[in-house]
């Protein structure tokens, strides 16, 4: 299916837009997500989140190049997921305090 027809389906809020997107760009989006996340399950989740992101963005946005539009959404979602996973490994949102000898004396 042509990109313009897929975009029209999104614009009409037709759920066939998601299946058409998956059929045409699913492997492309998965490739992007997997190369960032290196985990099959996380990559699949990012791709599904990409479809939701496209659904929420079209309308009002009507992308000129659907492939690029989806790639940017996938990349953004995957990078956020990667950062969240690695932040947790570093201690999450905890702030560690380093006390030197000067700050110890109050």
Task: Show which residues each predicted segment covers.
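Arg/Lys-rich amphipathic alpha helix in sigma70-family domain 2
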Residues: 75-93
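Acidic, Ser/Thr- and Pro/Gly-rich low-complexity regulatory segments
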Residues: 2-6
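Residue-level preference for hydrophobic side chains embedded in well-ordered alpha helices
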Residues: 21, 25, 29, 50, ...
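Acidic, proline/glycine-rich intrinsically disordered inter-domain spacer in sigma factors
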Residues: 90, 97-106
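Short, charged helix-capping/linker segments at alpha-helix termini
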Residues: 11-20, 30-49
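Sigma70-family region 2
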Residues: 11-12, 38, 48-66, 84-86
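Alpha-helix N-cap and coil->helix boundary residues
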Residues: 20, 42-46, 65, 69, ...
